[in-house]
Amino acid sequence: MDIFKVLSRGATIQRNGKHRKDLTLLNHAAPKDTQDNVDIEVARETDFFKTKTDTYSKKRVAEEAELDNEEEEEAPPPIISTPEEAVVFRNKHKINITGEDSPLPIGSFEDLITRFNLHPYLLANLKKNKYTDPTPIQCESIPTMLNGRDLIACAPTGSGKTMAYSIPMVEMLGKKKGSKDAKKGIKALVVAPTKELASQIFNAVFSLCVGVGKKKDELKPCLLDKSTADKLRNGKVSSQKYDICITTPLRLVSALNDGSLDLGSLDLVIFDEADKLFEKGFATQVDDILAACPSGIQKTLFSATIPASVEQLANSIMSTDPLRIIIGNKQAAAQTVEQKLVYAGNEEGKLVAIRQMAREGQLVAPVIIFLQSIDRAKALFKELVFDGINVDQIHGDMTAAKRASVIDRFRNGEVWVLICTDVLARGIDFRGINLVINYDVPQSAQSYVHRIGRTGRAGRLGKAVTFFTKEDATNVKVVVNVMKQSGQEVPDWLNNLAPLTQKERDNIKNRPIKRKKISTQHALANNKKKRAKQQMKGLKKMKKDDE
């Protein structure tokens, strides 16, 4: 439905005289049911991320209930009960499993009831939060974790990885919570690279924990943010009251060093976005975290991309028999994302291209635009604000509260275009993103996959456009390789580019291209300014010489 059609709906004027009676309607309120229906339609069209609750009339609720009752009975939930059925399932979803004695995947969440005696409250919470059918990574990882196996899991962005580890984590801890010899304190630890992702994981886990555990003693997750860390440090709260801790590496290491957090009861540690956590920037902190964990605990790693170097490190911390689950290609993007490369020539050409997209109606909200630096994000924000586009920005220079506010406004549809750096590229789930634009070519395949993974999530279709210039002749090969592995069409002349050497990959990742300033000003105007400055310098020098 076109929102502008809804807003501009009019009336048909009758010319047989009967319209006079209808004119009296101008003096009265519109019929409530009709007005409610229009309001609901408009609200739905502007609620990009489906965050608002519809205000249904009683009549509408009754009608929908009647339709539900008329639906045919659903078929029984699927169950995978033999190795042969598992092979068919894995071939269908391009699942590759490495390791001995891998358990059968589940066919449905109901399958967990018979196989693992799933906690009834957990199943109810899944249904309440509209998790009806497990995704391929959930089908494989849930039974693997419930069997106590260490796990390295790689699945496309938007494929449900958070629930893939949250469901078995809550189920395992829920059963222990009700036992007589249950330990007090943090029993599961989830580590994520960014505050935003950690907060999102906490919300997902919290929604699953409702009612799980003994009566009046539910599982208690905590988000180790600044506020919670201060309370722990000051003794206002004890870590013993929590069962699950969700945190970023630096915050956790700080709490471990000052003694405010104890991991002595830990049974499970989960590294989300493991490819980022096992890079050099986080390596020392991850080592400190692992050193604080009891020996022999269960370890799991999840990510959308797992390079060979990261996998090698991951294997070194695992038990002797970890399972490795790969959904699709470990360096490919989700199949639901249509990828496109646009040659812009130079920096001025990028501005022209994005403004042309705006004029032609291609910036269908909501849209995310990625840039390589904070300064460039700020500059593009100023340009698009001047163009009258409903845009905002988010980057590392902003406070956590300000970033959270911008994210909320974007989720609620108050902001249509969001400009950001890679701070938003990992894990943040905006389910309704229509378009991702890489204004600057990303510096690695992992960065590209995570950026465009903000769209095409949970089975929805999305688009990703990457601008590149003549300065990106080498960098663009990173994008081309991912596009090929994802089955996307690549122009012939780009297909013929020589493959990247390891040295080139390292240079691209560690040395960002020095790009010209983002500005509307024409080169001629810049030259005039330059000449004026030179003339001013000359005049000052002449004046100084005369003195």
Swiss-Prot record:
SUBUNIT field: Interacts with the U3 snoRNA and is associated with the 90S and 40S pre-ribosomes.
Record domain Helicase C-terminal: where: 336-498
Protein name per UniProt: ATP-dependent RNA helicase ROK1
Name of the gene: ROK1
Keyword Nucleotide-binding: yes
Molecular function GO labels: ATP binding; ATP hydrolysis activity; RNA binding; RNA helicase activity
GO cellular component: nucleolus; small-subunit processome
Predominant place of localization: nucleus
Subcellular compartments: Nucleus, Nucleolus
General function of this protein: ATP-dependent RNA helicase involved in 40S ribosomal subunit biogenesis. Required for the processing and cleavage of 35S pre-rRNA at sites A0, A1, and A2, leading to mature 18S rRNA.
Motif (DEAD box): 272-275
Domain free text: The Q motif is unique to and characteristic of the DEAD box family of RNA helicases and controls ATP binding and hydrolysis.
Residue span(s) of domain Helicase ATP-binding: 142-324
Keywords: ATP-binding, Helicase, Hydrolase, Nucleotide-binding, Nucleus, Ribosome biogenesis, RNA-binding, rRNA processing
Basic residues bias: start-end ranges: 527-547
GO biological process: endonucleolytic cleavage in 5'-ETS of tricistronic rRNA transcript (SSU-rRNA, 5.8S rRNA, LSU-rRNA); endonucleolytic cleavage in ITS1 to separate SSU-rRNA from 5.8S rRNA and LSU-rRNA from tricistronic rRNA transcript (SSU-rRNA, 5.8S rRNA, LSU-rRNA); endonucleolytic cleavage to generate mature 5'-end of SSU-rRNA from (SSU-rRNA, 5.8S rRNA, LSU-rRNA); maturation of SSU-rRNA; snoRNA localization
